[in-house]
Amino acid sequence: MSKQFVRSAKNLVKGYSSTQVLVRNATSNDNHQVSKDSLIELAEKSYDSADFFEIMDMLDKRLNDKGKYWRHIAKALTVIDYLIRFGSENCVLWCRENLYIIKTLKEFRHEDDEGIDQGQIVRVKAKELTALLSDDERLNEERNMNIKGRNRKGRRRRGTGRSDENDDDLQRAISASRLTAEEDERRRKQDEDYETALQLSKEEEELKRLQDLQRMQQQQGQQQLQQPMYYDIFGNPITPEEYAQFQLQQQQQQQQQQLQQQPMYYDVFGNPITPEELAQFQQQQQLQEQQYLASMQQQQQAMSNNPFAKSEQSSSSPKRNQLVAASSPQQLQQQKQQEPLIQNRTGNQSMTDKYSKLNELLATGTGIDTFGNVGEARIPAQHTKTGTFINSQGTGYRQVSDDPNHNPFLNSQYTGLPSTSVVPTQTGYGFGNQSQQQSQNNGSNNRGYTLIDL
């Protein structure tokens, strides 16, 4: 009673007409079904243009109501279904023009507090109305049949009063509509289940393909981060194996160029040696030369006062292996053949320069020396400058006689040398390293030698 009172008060406050109030009561938000009297009255009022617009305006508001007022929507669809069957032709035209509103209700859903989907009845009624409005032949046939039945019922109503409450035709039509709606709903569920399963299968397949693609992209990205990209001279990407092969070829070419530019070294036997061995040998050779030069300086200092000592600079020098840098053993042999022979000097250069004139006279002249020798038998004068005879081999060295009585020829010999007696200097290993006692013995033994003894 409270809801009816509130609805009545709202009708008065908003100034609804009797036709609008009739539509509001027929589509109220309660559990009661729409009364048949209200449907018949609304169908009759639909033939009036003013009432028609009021009826359709209120039904349009009910169809666009909120989801929690699902009873308003369901009852409004029931009223529209009755009007297109038993109402005026304008009701059919209005429904066809606003068919999109009815089609949207085919997807209507609403769950109550208990989790029950109350939008099922709305979806069934909307689908049935859409099918009926789309089939003109069926709609015209039902309208003609219902109009004839309504006329018969009108005549019976005038004769029998209110005997049309249990109209069998209306009950059969409602039952047929319900069966059709249930069958369509069952078929739609099956189609929806199949479509849902197919859609899920497609989505799973697409998701799997996307995951595989992402995994491949991640692996490629990791490989690119771990391995740098290499390019050839034309900017084309190459694999690391090709780049390593290219680097190896470059290294081999560089090594070949270095070998071609670097000279080959050979020993005296023509065997190739490495630059390290050459450097080591040169270092050893330099050390040997330094040692040899040091020893030669000592010998020259000791031999500076001995005009008869032979210079052993070239004769006593050690033979050293020579290394030749050449590109081939043939060039080494040619260099050996082209090397000129080095003339080794013997004797003291200063003495040779000093007595060069005398040597020339003695070698080319035809005179006789102090001993009467002629030709090659002549003895150079420098061997007798001390006043005591010394032959060309140095025998009789240190023959200095205090008593010249044994040889009367020595005191009278004069070969152009100064008369000042020359004291011999002990040089060389053979003379300078002898002990003093041995030297005195040699002097006493050699004293008194004559030309005949020598």
Curated annotation (Swiss-Prot):
The keyword Repeat applies. Residues 142-195, 292-350, 384-405, 418-454 are annotated as: Disordered. GO terms for molecular function: clathrin binding; K63-linked polyubiquitin modification-dependent protein binding; phospholipid binding; ubiquitin binding. InterPro entries: ENTH, ENTH_VHS, UIM_dom. Residues 165-184, 189-208 form the UIM domain. It holds the Pfam family ENTH. CDD domains: ENTH_Ent1_Ent2. Residues 180-191 have a biased composition (Basic and acidic residues). This is Epsin-1. It comes from Saccharomyces cerevisiae (strain ATCC 204508 / S288c).
